[in-house]
């Protein structure tokens, strides 16, 4: 027995963390570039997923970016990654009323996920932090604690808030629905789940909703870049620190690799996934003649982000104009778009997200004040933040959060299906960097 313990200890000490899978691309109209990096970190399984894609819809070049952090396994995060954006771009009001379309797509995807979960005995769920670029608009939507941060005028601003059960409005909503919030290492819904909004989580669905908070920003010369990341990054980075790193590295792929690598060095115990989108509006405007007609007809460049394909150092250092040749690849593989293996720990960030964005939109929130958790630098605030939670934190020093669900601790509420409006999008061929099935033109699920 002693030998086994020694062998296990030696194995854990010698475990090598693989370099993050990474890639990037440039939009067809030259208005934005992007990069991504993802690593299992110190874990032996991977529950993070991400999506980067560019579509032509009704004459508009549309960018769609997302980070999805699973709990209770990877299947919920993988499902959301496969279906959320496809549901969104086929919504009949995607261009005319994008906010409404986003809300419908979130609730519809959640409803369909719950149906697919009926055969599973163990609950699974996922966060989502998504960014939609349409014309001169940036729309950020999220559920859970995967955060979105922008750099505007050189300063960091959170454009999402982490959904935590101890936030006063979230706790009130949960209790009004018949649920409760209790301390179990951190504040948890039903003593089980450390986020108050998520996809899936069938047994807690009455309290853990997938209703997104949506924030809109104007894309102008002052907007420099956007960071989307799972909490594996935010556990060890403040918003300002992450923005400072990206400022120093012009190439978005290289900046995401640097963020992920530094998060591992700082001791992040979770999977780490990061997407950076750089806005090139001001640069392209100063370019001689802006973009030529020849450039306007080019196919969006891309590097694939299929995580079941291991990206070598040689591939990640190539120019980001490699066109994805795997569009017709069978997407039924269970390992699609998973990054190098790793497991989820859920050490939650103790940071207060920003109260107001650069355009004056309020996005206030409050994190639980847990002793022993990662402290983060103050965030720039433009208006009054949300009132503090009334919940008192017991005198404990636990900081490790476990988002895996124990289905025996909560009753199964009835899941209701959201119906969307009818219609079908007129779409150009999709330039997608993952999920070949999602790249095909599909009829609207809102019919």
Curated annotation (Swiss-Prot):
Biased composition (Polar residues): 346-374, 392-423
Catalytic activity line of the entry: O-phospho-L-seryl-[protein] + H2O = L-seryl-[protein] + phosphate; O-phospho-L-threonyl-[protein] + H2O = L-threonyl-[protein] + phosphate
Cofactor note: Binds 2 magnesium or manganese ions per subunit.
SUPFAM superfamilies to which the protein is assigned, alphabetical: PP2C-like
UniProt cofactor(s): Mg(2+); Mn(2+)
Domain PPM-type phosphatase: 33-279
Residues covered by region (Disordered): 284-447
GO CC annotations, alphabetized: plastid
Binding locations of Mn(2+) 2: 69, 231, 270
Broad enzyme group: hydrolase
Single GO term (MF): protein serine/threonine phosphatase activity
Keyword terms: Hydrolase, Magnesium, Manganese, Metal-binding, Protein phosphatase
Magnesium in keyword set: yes
Pfam family, one: PP2C
Disulfides per UniProt: none
InterPro entries referenced in this protein's UniProt entry, alphabetically: PP2C, PP2C_BS, PPM-type-like_dom_sf, PPM-type_phosphatase-like_dom
Biased segments, Low complexity type: 284-297
Similarity comment text for this entry: Belongs to the PP2C family.
Protein name: Probable protein phosphatase 2C 71
Organism: Arabidopsis thaliana
């Amino acid at each position: 027995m002693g030998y086994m313990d020694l062998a296990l200890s030696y194995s854990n000490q010698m475990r090598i963390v693989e370099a993050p899978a990474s890639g990037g691309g440039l939009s067809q109209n030259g208005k934005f570039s992007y990069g991504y990096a993802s690593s299992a970190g110190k874990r032996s399984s991977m529950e993070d997923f991400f999506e980067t894609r560019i579509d032509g819809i009704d004459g508009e070049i549309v960018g769609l970016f997302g980070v999805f952090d699973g709990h209770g396994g990877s299947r919920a995060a993988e499902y959301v990654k496969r279906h959320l954006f496809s549901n969104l771009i086929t919504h009949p009001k995607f261009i005319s009323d994008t906010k409404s379309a986003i809300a419908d797509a979130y609730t519809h995807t959640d409803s369909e996920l719950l149906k697919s979960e009926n055969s599973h005995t163990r609950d699974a769920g996922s966060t989502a932090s998504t960014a939609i670029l349409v014309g001169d608009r940036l729309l950020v939507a999220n559920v859970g604690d995967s955060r979105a941060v922008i750099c505007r005028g050189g300063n960091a601003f959170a454009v999402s808030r982490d959904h935590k059960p101890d936030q006063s409005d979230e706790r009130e909503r949960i209790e009004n629905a018949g649920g409760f919030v209790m301390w179990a290492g951190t504040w948890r819904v039903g003593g089980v789940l450390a986020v108050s909004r998520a996809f899936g989580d069938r047994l807690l669905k009455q309290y853990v909703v997938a209703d997104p908070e949506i924030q809109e920003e104007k894309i102008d010369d002052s907007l420099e870049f956007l960071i989307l990341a799972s909490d594996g990054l935010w556990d060890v980075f403040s918003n300002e620190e992450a923005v400072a790193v990206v400022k120093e590295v012009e190439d978005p792929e290289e900046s995401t690799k640097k963020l992920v690598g530094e998060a591992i060095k700082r001791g992040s115990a979770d999977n780490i996934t990061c997407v950076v989108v750089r806005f090139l509006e001001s640069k392209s405007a100063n370019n001689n003649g802006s973009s030529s007609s020849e450039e306007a007809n080019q196919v969006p460049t891309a590097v694939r982000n299929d995580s079941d394909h291991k990206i070598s150092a040689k591939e990640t250092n190539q120019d980001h104009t490699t066109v994805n040749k795997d569009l017709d690849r069978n997407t039924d593989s269970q390992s699609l778009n998973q990054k190098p293996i790793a497991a989820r720990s859920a050490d939650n960030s103790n940071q207060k997200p920003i109260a107001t964005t650069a355009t004056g939109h309020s996005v206030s929130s409050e994190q639980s004040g847990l002793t022993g958790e990662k402290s983060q630098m103050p965030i720039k605030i433009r208006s009054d933040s949300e009132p503090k939670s009334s919940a008192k934190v017991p005198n404990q020093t636990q900081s490790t959060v476990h988002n895996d669900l124990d289905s025996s601790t909560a009753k199964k509420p009835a899941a209701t299906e959201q119906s969307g409006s009818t219609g079908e999008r007129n779409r150009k061929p999709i330039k997608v960097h993952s999920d070949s099935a999602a790249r095909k033109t599909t009829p609207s699920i809102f019919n």
